[in-house]
Amino acid sequence: MKLHELKPSEGSRKERNRVGRGTGSGNGKTSGRGHKGQKARSGGGVRLGFEGGQLPLFRRIPKRGFTNINRKEFAIVNLDVLNRFEDGTEVTPELLIESGIIRNEKSGIKILSDGNIEKKLTVKANKFSAAAKEAIEAAGGKTEVI
């Protein structure tokens, strides 16, 4: 086989469909848009959620809830991620940011118990789940709320 003999595999390349190029092509005159109407016009089409003039679902259903502007959002760290640190390391928020585990502290850091921990670490965070605290202490480590 030579370079000039290379061809793309069958069915991997599809030719662009050129519309509005004569009635013989099968896609001439109206270019596959049918006759008149909103969808035949340039830029024509209905907005998202439009139901043909019927009151749309998002307006039929009542409003519910609100966004609390004073909410606290915690950066979440799971136990299995903490295994990358050496035994006896003091894991602080600064160390977590430095090592790229979290991007920023947000309203604080919460340690959750996804995965398991084999290292003996001193973990400093704003919050711990009960299971995470138990697992860290079972591995011989300490938890400190800051």
UniProtKB/Swiss-Prot annotation:
Domain of life: Bacteria
Disulfide pairings: none
Recorded coiled-coil stretches: none
Subunit structure: Part of the 50S ribosomal subunit.
Bias (Gly residues): 21-31
Region (Disordered): 1-50
PROSITE patterns tied to this protein: RIBOSOMAL_L15
Transmembrane segments: none
UniProt keyword Zinc-finger present: no
Protein name: Large ribosomal subunit protein uL15
InterPro entries, per database record: Ribosomal_uL15 (IPR030878), Ribosomal_uL15/eL18 (IPR021131), Ribosomal_uL15/eL18_sf (IPR036227), Ribosomal_uL15_bac-type (IPR005749), Ribosomal_uL15_CS (IPR001196)
One Gene Ontology molecular-function label: structural constituent of ribosome
Pfam short name (any one): Ribosomal_L27A
Function: Binds to the 23S rRNA.
